[in-house]
Amino acid sequence: MDSADIRSAKAALEKAIQGKNIETIINIMTRLKNEVVATEELLKETRLGLVVGKLRSHPNEKVGEQAREIVKKWKADVSKGRPLKTTTTTSSTPSKHADVGSQAQKQVQKQSSSGQRTFKSDNVNVNVTDDKIRNNCIGLMYNALVIDSDESSSLIIAKAKEIDAQVLARAAGKTGSEYRNRMRSLYMNLKDKNNPKLRASVLRNEITPQRLSTMTSAELASEDRRKEDAKLEQENLFHAQGAKPQKAVTDLFTCGKCKQKKVSYYQMQTRSADEPMTTFCECTVCGNRWKFS
């Protein structure tokens, strides 16, 4: 693909993303993976890497996986020095080739694979305040935000400093336990490799540092963890002991799993007294459980 073809493919990809056409997105990315040999200059000129990079946190698993594969391949392309196509023009001086190769290598170091970028590898100074605790926390924020990211180090350190400032303000300007515990909680959630959406949302400013500093543990959690928590909550409801009415078996309810009508049930008041009671059902055939009110 030349630059014109790539721009055309990029426009089509953006349209497919906007229209949520998963099949088209995957088809276009397959072409990009097979036909594009990435160079630093090409990625800067077309800004294609930004579009594909954002898809790594796409809710569709296939789209996210393919986007990650493409980004990995393009990083390898740049690493191998493919921007230096071996033309026979003798006018190109060795020093120019060396300069371009050096720039490409620096770019690869900044865009290394998942888990390898840190503020140290990016040569970023995190000692930007007079407080050692704050500087350490800013470094932790940088290391968490940079996971799987191709964003510039200047953007990431700016975000890390903004997060520090917001958390510090909420802790009355003191780096005591409130500040440290909050920064530790944010670090643990941001560095979670199963939580790419949170990192991406912060870097895109979809979640501002101010908003991030006030988010609850449930809001910070990854989708997988939220599902696990919801499942656990449901299990706890069903296994709750105490003043629980006697179960009765009826054929009035149909199991959504096995379609049988041998269902035991009981009712409990789980909300306020003026709200309907919650009915807890369990299929006696397959063990499927559900509730409604």
From Swiss-Prot:
SUPFAM superfamilies: Conserved domain common to transcription factors TFIIS, elongin A, CRSP70 (SSF47676), Elongation factor TFIIS domain 2 (SSF46942), Zinc beta-ribbon (SSF57783)
GO (cellular component) term, any one: cytoplasm
SMART domains for this protein: TFS2M, TFS2N, ZnF_C2C2
Domain of life: Eukaryota
Coiled coil: none
Residue span(s) of domain TFIIS N-terminal: 4-81
Molecular function as annotated in GO: DNA binding; transcription elongation factor activity; zinc ion binding
PROSITE patterns attached to this UniProt entry: TFIIS_CENTRAL, TFIIS_N, ZF_TFIIS_1, ZF_TFIIS_2
Keywords noted in UniProt: DNA-binding, Metal-binding, Nucleus, Transcription, Transcription regulation, Zinc, Zinc-finger
Segments forming domain TFIIS central: 133-248
Binding site for Zn(2+): C255, C258, C283, C286
Subcellular location: Nucleus
Region of interest (Disordered), residue spans: 81-123
Compositionally biased residues, Low complexity: 100-116
Disulfide bonds: none
ZnF endpoints (TFIIS-type): 251-291
Record Gene3D superfamilies: 2.20.25.10, Conserved domain common to transcription factors TFIIS, elongin A, CRSP70, Transcription elongation factor S-II, central domain
Residues making up the signal peptide according to the UniProt record: none
GO biological process, alphabetically ordered: regulation of transcription by RNA polymerase II; transcription elongation by RNA polymerase II
PANTHER family: IP08861P-RELATED, TRANSCRIPTION FACTOR S-II ZINC FINGER DOMAIN-CONTAINING PROTEIN
Family affiliation: Belongs to the TFS-II family.
Function: Necessary for efficient RNA polymerase II transcription elongation past template-encoded arresting sites. The arresting sites in DNA have the property of trapping a certain fraction of elongating RNA polymerases that pass through, resulting in locked ternary complexes. Cleavage of the nascent transcript by S-II allows the resumption of elongation from the new 3'-terminus.
Protein known as: Transcription elongation factor S-II
Gene (name only): tfs1
